[in-house]
């Protein structure tokens, strides 16, 4: 049986990347909260 998680770097970045977070109001809220919390990595594209 094929496993359900087949990682793709491009899809990961397109869905959870910085630009996609900035594109929506809720995404910007996510970044704001992660900045407030002091996260070292805001999004997956900060690797």
Curated annotation (Swiss-Prot):
Could you confirm whether the keyword Coiled coil appears in this record?
no
- GO annotation terms (biological process): translation
Q: Where is this region: Disordered?
A: 1-26
A Pfam short name: Ribosomal_L34
Basic residues: bias regions: 1-19
Keywords carried by this UniProt record: Ribonucleoprotein, Ribosomal protein
The record's listing under HAMAP family reads: Ribosomal_bL34
Organism of this sequence: Mycoplasma mobile (strain ATCC 43663 / 163K / NCTC 11711)
What's the domain of life for this entry?
Bacteria
Q: Which family does it belong to?
A: Belongs to the bacterial ribosomal protein bL34 family.
Entry protein name: Large ribosomal subunit protein bL34
Which segment of the chain is annotated as a signal peptide? none
Q: Name one GO cellular component term.
A: ribosome
GO MF: structural constituent of ribosome
Write down the InterPro entries for this protein, in alphabetical order.
Ribosomal_bL34, Ribosomal_bL34_CS
């Amino acid at each position: 049986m094929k496993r359900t998680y087949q990682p793709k770097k491009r899809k990961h970045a397109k869905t959870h990347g910085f630009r996609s977070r900035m594109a929506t109001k809720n995404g910007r809220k996510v970044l704001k909260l992660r900045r407030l919390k002091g996260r070292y990595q805001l999004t997956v594209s900060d690797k």
